[in-house]
UniProtKB/Swiss-Prot annotation:
It comes from Bacillus subtilis (strain 168). Gene3D superfamilies: YheA/YmcA-like. Belongs to the UPF0342 family. It holds the Pfam family Com_YlbF. InterPro entries: Com_YlbF (IPR010368), YheA/YmcA-like_dom_sf (IPR023378). This is UPF0342 protein YheA.
Length: 117
């Protein structure tokens, strides 16, 4: 019997959308966006994070000033309870997706051998 991988992928998408992890993430995201101050703070954090990632991917050096600014931004958002909770929920969702990716990649790892060693 042939497996339609797209159907399986869409089933997985629906399962993720229905999960407690995603529901919590979405609720926290909505709460942060409903608070104008928190929304601006979170958007600023994301902008700083994105700029640093882009520089890193382009092979550009990140200055000490940028590191200091990023640290200040992280410290600020971590003090905001809802943003901090949102970041924790994002991390949990990222871990879940990482675990799913490991499961999906398992046949290739078994075929070619583990990249890790």
């Amino acid at each position: 019997m042939a497996v339609n991988f797209y159907d399986v992928a869409y089933d997985l998408e629906n399962a993720l959308r229905g999960s407690e992890e995603f529901t919590r993430l979405k609720n926290l995201y909505d709460e942060v966006n409903a608070d104008e101050s928190a929304k601006r703070m979170f958007e600023n954090f994301r902008d700083v994070q994105l700029r640093l990632q882009q520089k890193q991917m382009a092979g550009e050096e990140i200055t000490q000033e940028e590191v200091t600014q990023a640290q200040k931004t992280v410290a600020l958002v971590q003090q905001h309870e809802k943003i901090s909770q949102l970041m924790e929920a994002e991390q949990r969702m990222s871990m879940l997706i990482g675990e799913l990716n490991k499961i999906i990649m398992k046949p290739l790892e078994e075929l070619y051998g583990s990249v890790e060693g």
